[in-house]
């Protein structure tokens, strides 16, 4: 799962940057490693996700579909983390109540 998450994170960053070198700088990963990850993801999905040119990359139709889904997933993760942080700030915890018999 972690491997797939990393591939989708790389895919998402390349799509946002619209070029591999920008994504490599943002992710602190070499350009060849980015290219290899994208190729691995494309191979596992059985489709081409990017059109490649000397000026950068652009999403294919399947790439656009995947981008929306990955973006939604990342937003859901972020929202979940924010909800957990709010929960923790509320001081939710264990409450003990003692009563005595009269």
Language-model segment annotations:
Residues 4-7, 31, 63, 70, ...:
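The N-cap/first-turn positions of alpha helices
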Residues 7-14, 66:
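Short alpha-helical "packing" element that flanks the helix-turn-helix/winged-helix DNA-binding module
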Residues 12-28:
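Short helix-boundary/capping micro-motifs
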Residues 17, 26, 39-48, 81:
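Residue cluster at the C-terminal edge of the helix-turn-helix DNA-binding motif
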Residues 42-64:
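A short LG(V/I)-centered, amphipathic sequence patch enriched
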Residues 44-45, 66-88:
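Alpha-helical linker/hinge and terminal dimerization helices associated
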Residues 85-102:
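Interdomain hinge and pocket-entrance segments immediately C-terminal to HTH DNA-binding domains
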